[in-house]
């Protein structure tokens, strides 16, 4: 394990030297991928969220990366989201009410209290973090230099989830009521970054949750439905006109590769399905039918070669497994990650 950690540390340091302060971006062009960060959400209560680091060349994974770099401190209780921005990873830990700002070269983290906000999803723009929060329903703007909250935009009664930015606007999913988790909204808030006020709302489908930027003018929203008579769906929003395209299939999680969404729909009690969605709303078949020994919980596509990464949920009882498949469906490797691996970020030069 020490040798693995040394190799991974060298990879991370090399990548940081080549890094520059840039926006969280839609992939494209030639990139060199050396590894991946895996956010392990952890179960509610046991304080077992973590971050794993994968060395792709050796197919070795270090599940103690964050813990070892921070004097045996665990990440916290239910890590929700992770982004890389410049030389740092930023992680929201909902039940711990914290934001972690992690130096990617060393793994050392500055922990920031978020009071009782219950931070959820993160987007980045202009040296700021934009974080959706449950309590109260709002989005906050955090300066990445001072790690302080600069401003707050309140969003109404429903709890917000995913957030993405395009055309000078933040798009935030309005999901469900705190007082009644079975009362769902069907709106996406549009917040102007300059005014930091709600400029509009866009009607989508019941229970919008994940939100990603598909391209410079397209926002994709996965709508989970009500687990009953309203089916899951995916809605594409034109970031300029705020017009919508309803795709007709659900997206529990999404990853962007070459201008397309690689998505899966994993309804409770149902069989997972996989698809590729284009910006015009057309749907094509996934290149293969993944077999990952359980329900999917994360998806990512290596921007350098199109390899598809999927993680399962370990049935919420044991650590999940991370699978890597070539585009033709051939399995390259399988490695055990942490509890509930939920997000994959590739480490690029």
List PLM regions with ranges.
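Bacterial N-terminal signal peptides that target proteins for export
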Residues: 1-8
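C-terminal motif of bacterial Sec signal peptides marking the signal peptidase cleavage site
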Residues: 16-19
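Predominantly soluble domains enriched in secretory-pathway, periplasmic, or organellar proteins
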Residues: 21-349
């Amino acid at each position: 394990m020490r040798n693995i950690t040394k190799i991974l540390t060298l990879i991370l340091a090399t990548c940081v030297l080549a890094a520059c302060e840039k926006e969280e971006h839609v992939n494209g062009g030639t990139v060199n991928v050396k590894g991946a960060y895996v956010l392990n959400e952890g179960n509610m209560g046991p304080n077992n969220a973590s971050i794993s680091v994968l060395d792709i060349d050796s197919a070795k994974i270090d599940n103690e990366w964050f813990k070892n770099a921070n004097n045996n401190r665990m990440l916290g209780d239910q890590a929700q989201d992770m982004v890389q921005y410049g030389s740092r990873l930023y992680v929201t830990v909902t039940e711990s009410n914290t934001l972690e700002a992690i130096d990617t070269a060393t793994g050392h983290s500055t922990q920031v209290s978020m009071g009782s906000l219950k931070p959820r999803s993160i987007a980045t723009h202009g040296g700021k973090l934009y974080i959706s929060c449950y309590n109260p329903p709002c989005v906050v703007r955090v300066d990445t230099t001072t790690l302080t909250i600069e401003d707050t935009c309140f969003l109404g009664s429903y709890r917000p989830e995913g957030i993405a930015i395009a055309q000078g606007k933040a798009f935030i999913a309005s999901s469900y009521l705190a007082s009644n988790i079975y009362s769902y909204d069907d709106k996406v808030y549009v917040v102007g970054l300059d005014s930091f006020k709600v400029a509009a709302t866009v009607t989508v489908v019941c229970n919008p949750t994940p939100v990603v930027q598909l391209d410079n003018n397209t926002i994709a929203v996965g709508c989970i439905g009500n687990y009953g008579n309203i089916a899951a769906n995916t809605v594409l929003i034109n970031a300029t006109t705020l017009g919508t395209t309803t795709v007709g299939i659900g997206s529990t999680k999404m990853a962007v590769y070459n201008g397309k969404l690689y998505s899966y729909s994993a309804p409770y009690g149902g069989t997972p399905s996989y698809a590729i969605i284009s910006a015009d709303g057309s749907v094509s078949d996934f290149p293969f039918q993944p077999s990952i020994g359980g329900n999917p919980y994360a998806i990512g596509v290596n921007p350098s070669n199109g390899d598809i990464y999927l993680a399962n949920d370990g049935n919420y009882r044991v650590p999940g497994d991370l699978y890597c498949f070539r585009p033709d469906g051939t399995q390259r490797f399988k490695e055990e990650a942490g509890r509930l691996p939920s997000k994959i970020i590739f480490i690029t030069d």
